[in-house]
Regions:
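Short, conserved loop/helix-junction motifs that constitute active-site signature segments
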Residues: 160-166
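Active-site glycine- and acidic-residue-rich loops that bind
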Residues: 149-153, 224-237
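Active-site metal-binding loops of divalent metal-dependent hydrolases
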Residues: 13-14, 65-68, 148, 174-175, ...
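Hydrophobic/aromatic beta-strand patches that form the interior of the parallel beta-sheet core
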Residues: 9, 144, 170, 211-213, ...
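Metallo-beta-lactamase
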Residues: 1-135, 139-151, 166-227, 244-251, 275-291
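Cap/insert and terminal regions of metallo-dependent hydrolase folds
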Residues: 83, 93, 101, 109, ...
Length: 319
């Protein structure tokens, strides 16, 4: 995707197939065709894992950092992990116990345990994707973490050492306070579902590289960060601007285009759903009917699109 003088390069890290999210709306045939690259015929949903690379001025900026090296873990289902193959019921029982202990609704418990049965996860591609883009990890000057969930910060370290040794790691203060403090949340869910270590443990080797921000700011010429909380306390988006053109990388403020089209539909993963809905509403109002191209680290192929409006309804068009 070219925005004025800047090129945004998609950096793939993996793909995650899960059961369809609860509340997925019925789509007419025309709309279903538009969203068919991630809402699959068998009723499952496909989500990409990845990041975006932008060269600007003297900086090489990576927006998000994927789930991480595959050696750190794997998904359940068809992952091939011996423990998951031998004892899937044990993993499901742990997930059920974890969610019930947190007071989760039974429908949420059922969905997550079903996801463990049918999900398919492949990851660990980011290093090769950077190579294909002609960039070495030590050439990255800035890594912007849209938030500190493990599928967005996963490559910050590998085997206890920094993967981007010369980069500033941009994280919002509110997320650092939430995920990296002594009172950090229990990340059992992610470990069971994705097979990865906690955010806190993976950020520990790069503590001295973290660049905290608490007000909307500029990372590099043409790249600005905006706080849009709800999914996590410090959830944010990145805005790339050049020659009066704009694109937005939405992190997990939006997981899939259907969340933009249908204001009543939301992927069930926001820490503060009410605040997340407000952020989504603000975003829709800003981009609807404009030439602003948007993507997220989970859109199919990390492709961009626009939110349009016609005949009294919103619809999605791929760029």
């Amino acid at each position: 995707m070219r925005i004025g003088d800047l090129e945004i390069i998609q950096i793939l890290d993996g793909e995650w197939t899960t059961p369809a999210a609860p509340g997925l709306p019925d789509l007419d045939p025309e709309a279903a065709a538009v969203h068919s690259n991630y809402i699959l015929p068998d009723g499952k949903m496909s989500a990409q894992l990845g990041a975006f690379l932008v060269r600007t001025g003297n900086q090489v900026v990576l927006l998000d950092a994927g789930l991480g090296p595959s050696a750190q873990g794997c998904g359940h289902g068809d992952c091939g992990h011996p423990e998951h193959q031998m004892k899937p019921q044990m993993v499901e029982a742990e997930v059920e116990e974890f969610f019930r202990s947190k007071g989760a609704p039974e429908a949420q418990v059922e969905w997550f345990t079903n996801m463990l049965r049918v999900q398919k996860l492949e990851h660990g591609w980011l290093e090769d994707s950077l190579t294909k883009a002609g960039v070495r990890p030590d050439e990255i000057t800035d890594v912007v973490l849209s938030h500190l969930h493990p599928d967005h910060m996963g490559w910050v370290s590998r085997d206890g050492a920094s993967f981007f040794p010369n980069a500033k790691l941009w994280a919002h203060q509110a997320d650092a306070d939430f995920f990296l403090s002594d009172t950090a949340p229990d990340e059992t869910t992610f470990k069971l579902m994705l097979g990865v270590d906690s955010t806190k443990s993976r950020m520990k080797p790069v503590h001295n590289q973290i660049e905290l921000w608490d007000r909307d700011c500029t990372v590099a010429p043409g790249i600005d960060l905006r706080h849009m909380p709800g999914h996590t306390p410090g959830s944010s988006i990145a805005i790339v601007s050049s020659r009066e053109e704009r694109a937005m990388m939405l992190g997990d403020v939006i997981h899939c285009p259907l969340e933009l089209v249908d204001s009543e539909f939301a992927i069930m993963s926001d820490i503060d759903p009410a605040m997340a809905k407000r952020s989504k509403d603000i975003l829709r109002q800003e981009i609807e009917g404009t030439n602003i191209h948007v993507s997220s680290s989970h859109f199919p192929g990390l492709e961009f699109g626009r939110l349009l409006k016609g005949e009294g309804k919103r619809y999605w068009a791929w760029s």
